[in-house]
Every structure is written in structure tokens, then in C-alpha cells.
Amino acid sequence: MKSIALTSLSLLPSALAQTIYLAGDSTMASSTPGWGDYIADSVSVEISNQAIGGRSARSYTREGRFQAIADVLQAGDYVVIEFGHNDGGSLSNDNGRTDCPGDGDETCETVYNGVAETVLTFPAYIENAALLFLEKGANVLISSQTPNNPWESGTFSYTPNRFVGYAELAAQRAGVDYVDHGAYTASIFEALGADTVNSFYPNDHTHTNAEGSSVVADAFLKAVVCSGVALNDVLTRTDFDGECL
């Protein structure tokens, strides 16, 4: 795999010609194992997987992780942004990840770890990150979150949650590419059937094992091909089963 896993983005070699940066949570992260590293063999450029478990769009922003990517990326690089699994909840018992309710410029005031914080909405955090990367000349792709196990109840069921729509809205507002990763993953999971898909989730209904993450990666790549977004230009594989959605 052509993959870069760094503890500090400052260590990234500046000589790399082109890189795909991945920003997300545990469903994408290397250590889980998430799907991010599994696209490496299907692209012609390097992967820098900066996804980290337990993060939301808010906490990734507060920790300076979007800015850290912006500080090292070069014009022509790609950034894939995918969040949503950790963005729900209530600010009344603030876990540091929950976003302000709404889909626009609403704000909420909170105190987290003894520090006052103005909390933005999910679309605002994602849009701000996309605009930050655009200013650096990057090709930005916002991706909807992966589904929880749609076979968990014994019958296939997939209904996109609000963060899927919010991700698409943020992409529209920022003027960047969007793929519905969740829908493509759900479609493939429906075709594979309950027994196979249930085996992908050995611990809980959110995190796939290595085999499942490989399938989720293929779903992402298929979404890229079918959507005709800029990232398609660096794919070395475009032969995915099934029709486009």
C-alpha cells in the first residue's frame, strides 16, 4: 500500500508530488482498521490518512487537525472529508464532540473542559474546512458517513441520517465535490446479504473489520467513479460491479 501514517504532519516530506489527505473518524482511520488505507492500491498517488478515532467535525476543528493538513498540503493535492458518526448528542452534557443543532450559521455557547467555546453547526465546520483547503489549491471532496450495520435487525434497512444531508449541503455551499459514500456502501451491503455483512461487524454496529473495511473502500471508489468527481483522475481502478446510483 502506498500509505503514509504520521504522528506529526510536520514530518510529511515536502517533496511528495501529489497526496490524498483523509480527514475523518475511526471508520476511516488506520488503527481501527477503517476504510481509508484500503483505497491505496487503487490510486496512483500517496495516501496520508489523518483520520482519528472518536472525532467529530467540531473536535477535529478544535484540535487544529484541519489546520495541520492545510499547513502541509500543496496545490493539486486532494482532501477527503468524512464525519458524522460522533457529531450527534446534546450540549447539555457536552462531550466535546456534539455540534450545534441546525444546518446554517447557528451557534451555541458551551463550556468544555473548563474552556468557553462557541460551537458551530456540522455544515459550518465542514464548509469552513473545505474553504480552508480550497484556499491552498486543493481538490476537496466531502463524503457522507458510512452506515451502521443495515442488517442489524435481521432485515435490511438503511435510512440516511441528518449528517448525510448536512455533508451534501456543506459541499454545495463550499462549491466542492460530494459523494454519497453511505448510499453506495448500503447498496453493496444489501447485495451481499445479512450473513456476510454481519461478519463485517464483530464488535459493534459501527466499526467494520479489515474485510468489511475493504468493501467499504470499494464503495467509496465506486462512488467516486460514478459521480465523476476530480479524485477519479488519480484512480487506477474503475471496474466496480453493479450500476451507479
From Swiss-Prot:
Name listed for the protein in its UniProt record: Rhamnogalacturonan acetylesterase
Assigned protein family: Belongs to the 'GDSL' lipolytic enzyme family.
GO aspect biological process, one term: pectin catabolic process
Catalysis: reaction(s): Hydrolytic cleavage of 2-O-acetyl- or 3-O-acetyl groups of alpha-D-galacturonic acid in rhamnogalacturonan I
Protein location: Secreted
Disulfide bond entries: C100-C108, C226-C244
Predominant location: secreted
Organism of origin: Emericella nidulans (strain FGSC A4 / ATCC 38163 / CBS 112.46 / NRRL 194 / M139) (Aspergillus nidulans)
